[in-house]
Amino acid sequence: MRKALKDSKRIVVKVGTSTLTYENGSVNLMRIEKLSRVISDICNMGKEVVLVSSGAIGVGVGKLRLEKKPETIREKQAVAAVGQCALMHIYNKFFGEYSHVVAQVLLTRDVLENERMKNNVCNTFDTLLEKGIIPIVNENDAISIDEIQNILNFGDNDNLSAIVSTLVNADTLIILSDIDGFYDSDPRTNEDSKMLKEVYEITPEIEECAGGAGSNRGTGGMVTKLSAAKVATSNGIDMILANGENPEILIDILNGEDIGTMFVAKKGE
């Protein structure tokens, strides 16, 4: 089953705020540098990668030296505007060191609702990838309240990453989180919880295992990851949920190693 991942040509990688920042909210430069190096190496293998990156608000909080996340929507959007600029500067610097060019793509939900805009976005992705450019995608937090309000919309970009996977016709979606995979109960509160290696169908029982919200640095929990898995697998895309603490895990996943939880695509449906 996992050996097929070796043949993945087009991959979407999603990293959340908790992967990109320390507990105190400051940017984890070492991890972003390693992530940039690993993705660059994957591209050097002849594969295409789209990076969906959260972290605009988290990085903005660190950049502005705020003690905590802002609470009002207008403050969050202002902080996101600062953070997105800083985040892209960091990505541009690190990917540039490995001779790769990146492009910023900021999306809002109306892209999905307007067929003309959707086609334009698809054409942009295709052109960037044809030219060997790595698209770095985020929701446009400065003008969109979907992720900020976290009302079952993109959800810390988990759902956005699945949607992007369908837009670019990806073979595989890899979501890097601060947890090793999908468990039958919360491993942070239940030491007897067991990680599921493969999920072939998202049943009501599986949904019940998802629990509630995620870490306090992001907005997505297991609920949004399951939602992303539904979108990806129903469109024939395998999804892997794994721990992003060491970005080199991406290489292992694409080598077909038994890492994280694999949500198996529904082929030919």
From Swiss-Prot:
Residues binding ATP are 14, 177-178, 219-225
- GO CC aspect terms: cytosol
CDD domains this protein is in? Answer: AAK_G5K_ProB
Q: What is its EC number?
A: 2.7.2.11
Q: Which domain of life is it from?
A: Bacteria
Q: Is Cytoplasm one of the keywords?
A: yes
Q: Could you give a single Gene Ontology term from the biological process aspect?
A: L-proline biosynthetic process
Q: Which UniProt keywords apply?
A: Amino-acid biosynthesis, ATP-binding, Cytoplasm, Kinase, Nucleotide-binding, Proline biosynthesis, Transferase
The pathway noted for it is: Amino-acid biosynthesis; L-proline biosynthesis; L-glutamate 5-semialdehyde from L-glutamate: step 1/2
Q: Which reaction does it catalyse?
A: L-glutamate + ATP = L-glutamyl 5-phosphate + ADP
What residues bind substrate, as annotated?
54, 141, 157
InterPro entries, A to Z:
AceGlu_kinase-like_sf (IPR036393), Asp/Glu/Uridylate_kinase (IPR001048), G5K_ProB (IPR041739), Glu/AcGlu_kinase (IPR001057), Glu_5kinase (IPR011529), Glu_5kinase/COase_Synthase (IPR005715), Glutamate_5-kinase_CS (IPR019797)
Molecular function GO terms recorded? ATP binding; glutamate 5-kinase activity
Subcellular location as annotated: Cytoplasm
The enzyme class is transferase
Its annotated function is as follows: Catalyzes the transfer of a phosphate group to glutamate to form L-glutamate 5-phosphate.
Write out the similarity annotation.
Belongs to the glutamate 5-kinase family.
The protein in question is named Glutamate 5-kinase
Species source reads Clostridium perfringens (strain 13 / Type A)
